[in-house]
Design a protein with these regions (language model features):
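Cysteine/selenocysteine-centered motifs that mediate thiol-based redox chemistry or coordinate metal-sulfur cofactors
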Residues: 138-168, 177, 267-294
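Short beta-strand scaffold segments in enzyme catalytic cores
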Residues: 86-88, 100-103, 139, 237-239, ...
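CN hydrolase (nitrilase-like) catalytic-core segments centered on the catalytic cysteine
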Residues: 62-85, 147, 153-256
Length: 294
C-alpha cells in the first residue's frame, strides 16, 4: 500500500497580499505538523482574483519564476519536508504573462512548472486579457511523492488534458482552482453549475483510474469596476478516488485546512477491473484533432 497524506488550504483572499501569504504560510506549517506530505494551494492564491476586470495595473502583481514567491514557498517546503503545489501569476518577459502552477520539492527546489493551457474569457473571468496560453504541454511533474498531473482550473473541463496526463504516467490529477457563482444566476442555476464542475472532474477520475485533488478559493470578492455584483467563490474543494468516489468535500462558504489519506496503489486495482486504457481505439481517434467534424 502506497499511502500519501495530502493537505490542502481552501482560503478566502483579500487585497492584502502580505496577509494572504502570511496565512498561507501558517496553513502550510499547520498541515506539515499534522503529517501532510503533499500540500496543494488554490489558483492565484497570493491575491484577489483580479481577472474580474481588464486593468493594466494588475500586471504589477506578476512575478518571475524563480522569484519571490518560489523562494517563499521553497523555504517552507524545505523547512517542513513537504512538496507544495503553488499557483502564480508569472511574468515570463515584458508583455508575456502566464497562469502558472509551480511544484516545490522537499528540498525547496522547483520540481517543475505547468502553464495553464485553456484560458477562459467569460463575464468576470477575463483571463485572456492577462494570460498567454501555456506552451509546455501536458506532462506530469516528477516528485518525491509521485508523478503529479498538475493542471489549472479551466483545464478541468477538458477530458483531453486529464487523459494526456494519465497516458504519461501521472499518479494523480491536481487542479488549483478559482471558480464561483455569477451574481445574476438563480440559486438553481448556481447549484447546477457547481455540481457540473464537480461531476466532470470525478468523471476524469473514473475514465483514467486516478485520484483527483481540486482546491478552490472561497468567499465573496467584489468587482472593482462595479459593473457586476462580484463573485461568490463556491469552495467545495474535494478529493475523489480513482472510481470517482468522494473521499472528502469541503464547505461552500468556509475556509478549511484538511488532510486526506490516499492509497495510490488503489489505482492499479481499479485499472485491472476497468481497463479503459487497454480498450482505447487509438486507430479511430484522428478526428479528435479537428476543431469540429463537418
Amino acid at each position: 500500500m502506497k499511502e500519501l497524506k495530502i493537505g490542502f488550504l481552501q482560503q478566502h483572499n483579500t487585497a492584502d497580499t502580505k496577509d494572504n501569504l502570511l496565512r498561507l504560510g501558517e496553513g502550510i506549517r499547520d498541515l506539515a505538523k499534522r503529517g501532510a506530505q503533499l500540500i496543494v494551494l488554490q489558483e492565484l492564491h497570493n491575491s484577489l482574483y483580479f481577472c474580474q476586470t481588464e486593468n493594466v495595473n494588475n500586471f504589477d502583481l506578476a512575478e518571475p519564476i524563480p522569484g519571490p514567491s518560489t523562494s517563499f514557498f521553497g523555504e517552507l517546503a524545505q523547512k517542513f519536508g513537504v512538496v507544495i503545489v503553488a499557483s502564480l501569476f508569472e511574468k515570463r518577459a515584458p508583455g508575456l504573462y502566464h497562469n502558472t502552477a509551480v511544484v516545490l520539492e522537499k528540498d525547496g527546489q522547483i520540481a517543475g512548472i505547468y502553464r495553464k493551457m485553456h484560458i477562459p474569457d467569460d463575464p468576470a473571468y477575463y483571463e485572456k486579457f492577462y494570460f498567454t496560453p501555456g506552451d509546455l504541454g501536458f506532462h506530469p511533474i516528477e516528485t518525491s511523492v509521485g508523478k503529479l498531473g498538475v493542471l489549472v482550473c479551466w483545464d478541468q473541463w477538458y477530458p483531453e488534458a486529464a487523459r494526456l496526463m494519465a497516458l504519461q504516467g501521472a499518479e494523480m490529477l491536481i487542479y488549483p482552482t478559482a471558480i464561483g457563482y455569477e451574481s445574476s444566476d438563480t440559486p438553481e442555476e448556481q447549484q447546477r453549475q457547481r455540481m457540473a464542475w464537480q461531476t466532470v472532474q470525478r468523471g476524469h477520475a473514473v475514465a483514467n483510474g486516478l485520484p483527483v485533488i481540486t482546491v478552490n478559493r472561497v468567499g465573496y470578492e467584489p468587482d472593482p469596476s462595479g459593473l457586476t455584483n462580484g463573485i461568490q467563490f463556491w469552495g467545495t474543494s474535494f478529493v475523489a478516488g480513482p472510481q470517482g468516489e468522494l473521499i472528502y468535500e469541503a464547505s461552500t462558504d468556509e475556509e478549511e485546512s484538511i488532510i486526506v489519506e490516499m492509497d495510490l496503489d488503489h489505482s492499479e486495482q481499479v485499472r485491472r477491473w476497468w481497463p479503459f486504457l487497454r480498450d482505447r481505439r487509438i486507430d479511430k481517434y484522428t478526428d479528435i484533432l479537428k476543431r469540429y467534424i463537418d
